[in-house]
Amino acid sequence: MSFSAVTKGELARIYSKDRCCQLAELAALIRMCGTLQLVGGAQKLNIKLTTENPAIARKLFKLFKDLFGVHIEVMIRRNPRLRKNNHYLMVVTHGMGSTDILEKVKILKKEANSFDISYGVPLMLLQNRCCRRAYLRGAFLGGGSVSDPEKTYHLEFVTHSHEHSESLRDLINDFQLTSKIVERKGSYVVYLKEGDQIVDLLNIMEAHSALLELENVRIYKQMRNDVNRIVNCETANLSKTVDAAIRQIENIEYIKNTVGLGYLPENLREIAEIRLEYEDATLKELGEMLSPAIGKSGVNHRLRKIDEIATKLQEGKIKN
């Protein structure tokens, strides 16, 4: 099961005891996964809702029953050729009070002889912070998804209304987040791409298990990146050390074969002889072999002097 499906399963099991939050969540669910169907004339509407998640279907059934005393029928549709998940179809008819429900969730405003549909987030239902959290939970259940954090950080809500996408973005950003909107194939996508912001939104929607899973993945990925960075740094440093040692030995050999090591001052000759004898020794180890011992910086200084002498010999600035 995908991370997104697991997250939705967790959110679908959350059921608020407060009627105001139930209404806010149902309003979002109808807006995101519902369609309105005109039947028998302009004054009659059906609400059709579809989902692939059985837990969401159960939640819709319970919300309609608890809020409006409506027992909706859940029909299961499956296309065996496509081998996809079941589709759960629910219909609230005009006779079951669909118009009244749409008015209660602030999607529909009934005029004398017509309907006025509201496409924005119903702010009248979201006076309390808990209701705003419930609305976001319903919006995610109805039209949201979150990517597998092992691959990328991305959470989105897909809606067909530009007005709704803007008000949904504003609602999310009221929680100090920075969601954005992009148009995709005729729909509007409200999205977050930062891992810490997705964690915050999961917390707002109360998907605590999904939040912990995402945090664990983030910590693991950070540790892996840190280890890789350290290994790369140490590898680069080791490569520089090896290259320097090879250069030092080549220069000492050049001096030895041209003017002889006796040409060097005693302090340089001593370190040159030890460098030739202990090719794999570190600067610290070379310094400890001298008498008296000197530190890494002292060893490095002497070896650089030897490099300069070898260069001058090669350039003919010192006569053999």
From Swiss-Prot:
Keyword Cell cycle (UniProt): yes
Single GO biological process annotation from the record: cell division
Gene Ontology molecular functions: DNA binding
Keyword Glycoprotein on entry: no
Pfam families for this protein: HTH_WhiA, LAGLIDADG_WhiA, WhiA_N
Ranges annotated as DNA-binding: 282-315
Entries under InterPro entries matching the protein: Homing_endonucl, Sporu_reg_WhiA_N_dom, Sporulation_regulator_WhiA, Sporulation_regulator_WhiA_C, WhiA_LAGLIDADG_dom
Gene3D superfamilies xref list: Homing endonucleases
SUPFAM superfamilies in the cross-refs: Homing endonucleases
Keywords annotated in UniProt: Cell cycle, Cell division, DNA-binding
Function in brief: Involved in cell division and chromosome segregation.
Family of this protein: Belongs to the WhiA family.
The protein's name in its UniProt record: Probable cell division protein WhiA
Recorded name of the encoding gene: whiA
